C-alpha cells in the first residue's frame, strides 16, 4: 500500500512517546500512521444476513476480511473503485451495508457486550450515523434510540443515513450534549458518548489532521469532554451502561476523562473491563480495563473505548430553563389506526407493536413507543418515520416507510432487472418488458424494497426522491 506524508508536531510526538506502552514500538506507530487507512464496511443486518451478503457480492471479486470485534464488519479491497465508487453501488444505495471505519465499530460492540440488551439508548454525538445505525441493527429496530447531533448541517446527513438503512426506532434531536443530564435524568438504559476530540487517530485518513494541534487545545477539549460525560452520566439510569469513546490518542482526552468521572462519583461509577471483548483485545488493554488502540496494533485508526456502569442514582441537576413548546402530534385512535394498518398492508407495509401511529394535520407518522416518555422533555428535530400523507383518494405512502417496513414478498412486489433498477436510481420511469398487474407496485431489486411505483400503461412512474437520484455507473456487475 502506498505511503503518504503525515504532519506531526514535535510536541505531539513527545506526548505519544510518553503515552505509548513499552510493549509497543514507536517506530511501528510512525510507520502505521504513514500508511493509508484500510477501507471497511459493516453489513446492515436489518436488511440482509451476513451470509446472504457474502453470497450476493461473491461474483464481484471483493476481498472481504472479517473485523475481529464486529461479526458483520469487514475490511474491503476492490479493484474498480475509480470506475465505480463503493458509495455508488446499488448495495450501498439500498442500505445493505454502511461504509464505516473499523475502529468506530468498537464502541457499539462494547455497548452490547456481555449480553447487554438496552431498550432505550442515547447516542450523544450521532452524525453521520455509523454508530446509530449499528446500534439500531443490534436492537433489531426495536426499543428506541435518541440520536443527538449538535451541528445543524449534520442532522440532515444523519437522517439520510438512518432512512437509507431502513431504521424506524430513532428520534433525532439537535442540542449541545450538556443539556441531557438535566433534561432527561436517569432515563436511558445505555448511552454512547463518542466525544468530540482532537482527532489524533485519524491521520491515516487525513494526513493534515494535526495542522492545528496543540497541547493547549487538548486541555480545552478535555474540559468539554468532562462536561459531556457528566451530563451523559446524569441521563443514565442506575444499572445502565455508558460507553465513552474518541478517535484520539492522548491520555488527557481519554483515560483522564474517565478517571475524573470516577473521582467525581466514586461510589456510583464502575469500570467494566474490555479485555474479553474480542480475541486479541488485551493487546490494547489499559490498567483500568479500557481499550487504547494505537494504529499499529490492529492496522486501523487510533481509537479509545471505555465502558462504565452506573451502580446507583446520583443527585439530580437543576431543571432546564428552556421551553420545549407544544408537541404538534396526536396519537391516532385505535379504530382509525386499524384502517390505516389494513391499507398499508395492501401495499406491503407492516410494523409491530414497537411503533405507534401519530398524526399531524394530514401526515401520518410511526413513533417508537419507547421514546414517548421523552415527549415534553426535549424538542425533537425528527421523530420516528413519516408513514403517509392522507388525501381524498387514500394515502400517499412515503419512501422512508417503504425502505423500513415493506415486505419484498408482498403480492404486489415487482422485481426489477439490473438495467431497470439502474433507471430507477437515476430517477427515470421504468418500462418493464412484462408490466405488473397491479396499479400500485412495490418495486424491488435484489429482493430489497427500493420504492413504490404507479403503473401507467406500460410504464412504472418513478417515485424515487429527487434528492437521492444518482448519476454514473451504479452496478458492480457492470464495472
Curated annotation (Swiss-Prot):
GO MF annotations, alphabetized: RNA binding; rRNA (cytosine-C5-)-methyltransferase activity
InterPro entries cross-referenced by the UniProt entry: Methyltr_RsmF_N (IPR031341), MeTrfase_RsmB-F_NOP2_cat (IPR049560), MeTrfase_RsmB-F_NOP2_dom (IPR001678), Nol1_Nop2_Fmu_2 (IPR027391), Nop2p (IPR011023), RCMT (IPR023267), rRNA_ssu_MeTfrase_F (IPR023545), RsmB/NOL1/NOP2-like_CS (IPR018314)
Catalytic EC class: transferase
Entry keyword set: Cytoplasm, Methyltransferase, RNA-binding, rRNA processing, S-adenosyl-L-methionine, Transferase
Any one Gene Ontology BP term: rRNA base methylation
EC code: 2.1.1.178
Reaction equation(s) it catalyzes: cytidine(1407) in 16S rRNA + S-adenosyl-L-methionine = 5-methylcytidine(1407) in 16S rRNA + S-adenosyl-L-homocysteine + H(+)
Keyword Cytoplasm: yes
Residues annotated as the enzyme's active site: 247
An annotated GO cellular component: cytoplasm
Positions annotated to bind S-adenosyl-L-methionine: 125-131, 149, 177, 194
Subcellular location: Cytoplasm
Function, in words: Specifically methylates the cytosine at position 1407 (m5C1407) of 16S rRNA.
Protein family (similarity comment): Belongs to the class I-like SAM-binding methyltransferase superfamily. RsmB/NOP family.
PANTHER family xref list: 28S RRNA (CYTOSINE(4447)-C(5))-METHYLTRANSFERASE-RELATED (PTHR22807:SF30), NOP2 YEAST -RELATED NOL1/NOP2/FMU SUN DOMAIN-CONTAINING (PTHR22807)
Alphabetical list of NCBIfam families matching this protein: nop2p, PRK11933.1
Protein name, UniProt field: Putative ribosomal RNA small subunit methyltransferase F
Record organism: Shigella flexneri
Gene expressing this chain: rsmF
Amino acid at each position: 500500500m502506498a505511503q503518504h506524508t503525515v504532519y506531526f508536531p514535535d510536541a505531539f510526538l513527545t506526548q505519544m512517546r510518553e503515552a505509548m506502552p513499552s510493549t509497543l514500538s514507536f517506530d511501528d506507530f510512525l510507520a502505521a500512521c504513514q500508511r493509508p487507512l484500510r477501507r471497511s464496511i459493516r453489513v446492515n443486518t436489518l436488511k440482509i444476513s451476513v451470509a446472504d451478503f457474502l453470497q450476493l457480492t461473491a461474483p464481484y471479486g471483493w476481498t472481504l476480511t472479517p473485523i475481529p470485534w464486529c461479526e458483520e464488519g469487514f475490511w474491503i479491497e476492490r479493484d474498480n473503485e475509480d470506475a465505480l465508487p463503493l458509495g455508488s453501488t446499488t448495495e450501498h444505495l439500498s442500505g445493505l451495508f454502511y461504509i464505516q471505519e473499523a475502529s468506530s465499530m468498537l464502541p457499539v460492540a462494547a455497548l452490547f457486550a456481555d449480553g447487554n440488551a438496552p431498550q432505550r439508548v442515547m447516542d450523544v454525538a450521532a452524525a453521520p450515523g455509523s454508530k446509530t445505525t449499528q446500534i439500531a441493527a443490534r436492537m433489531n429496530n426495536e426499543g428506541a434510540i435518541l440520536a443527538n447531533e449538535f451541528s445543524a448541517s449534520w442532522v440532515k446527513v444523519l437522517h439520510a443515513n438512518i432512512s437509507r438503512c431502513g431504521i424506524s426506532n430513532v428520534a433525532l434531536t439537535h442540542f449541545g450534549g450538556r443539556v441531557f443530564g438535566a433534561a432527561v435524568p436517569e432515563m436511558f438504559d445505555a448511552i454512547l458518548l463518542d466525544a468530540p476530540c482532537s482527532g489524533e487517530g485519524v491521520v491515516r485518513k487525513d494526513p493534515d489532521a494535526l495542522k492545528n494541534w496543540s497541547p493547549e487545545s487538548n486541555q480545552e477539549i478535555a474540559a468539554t469532554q468532562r462536561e459531556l460525560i457528566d451530563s451523559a452520566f446524569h441521563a443514565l439510569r442506575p444499572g445502565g451502561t455508558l460507553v465513552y469513546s474518541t478517535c484520539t490518542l492522548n491520555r488527557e482526552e481519554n483515560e483522564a476523562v474517565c478517571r475524573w468521572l470516577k473521582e467525581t462519583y466514586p461510589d456510583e461509577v464502575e469500570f467494566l473491563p474490555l479485555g474479553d471483548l474480542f480475541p486479541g483485545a488485551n493487546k490494547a488493554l489499559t490498567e483500568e480495563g479500557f481499550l487504547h488502540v494505537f494504529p499499529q496494533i490492529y492496522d486501523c485508526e487510533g481509537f479509545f473505548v471505555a465502558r462504565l456502569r452506573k451502580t446507583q442514582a446520583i443527585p439530580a441537576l437543576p431543571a432546564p430553563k428552556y421551553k420545549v413548546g407544544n408537541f404538534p402530534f396526536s396519537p391516532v385512535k385505535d379504530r382509525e389506526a386499524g384502517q390505516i394498518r389494513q391499507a398499508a398492508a395492501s401495499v406491503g407495509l407492516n410494523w409491530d407493536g414497537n411503533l405507534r401511529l401519530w398524526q399531524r394535520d394530514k401526515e401520518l407518522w410511526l413513533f417508537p413507543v419507547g421514546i414517548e416518555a421523552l415527549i415534553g422533555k426535549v424538542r425533537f428535530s425528527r421523530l420516528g418515520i413519516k408513514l403517509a400523507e392522507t388525501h381524498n383518494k387514500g394515502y400517499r405512502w412515503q419512501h422512508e416507510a417503504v425502505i423500513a417496513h415493506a415486505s419484498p414478498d408482498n403480492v404486489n412486489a415487482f422485481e426489477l432487472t439490473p438495467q431497470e433498477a439502474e433507471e430507477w436510481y437515476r430517477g427515470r420511469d421504468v418500462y418493464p418488458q412484462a408490466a405488473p398487474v397491479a396499479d400500485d407496485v412495490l418495486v424491488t431489486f435484489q429482493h430489497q424494497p427500493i420504492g413504490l411505483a404507479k403503473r401507467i400503461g406500460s410504464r412504472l412512474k418513478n417515485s424515487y426522491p429527487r434528492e437521492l437520484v444518482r448519476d454514473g455507473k451504479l452496478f458492480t456487475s457492470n464495472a
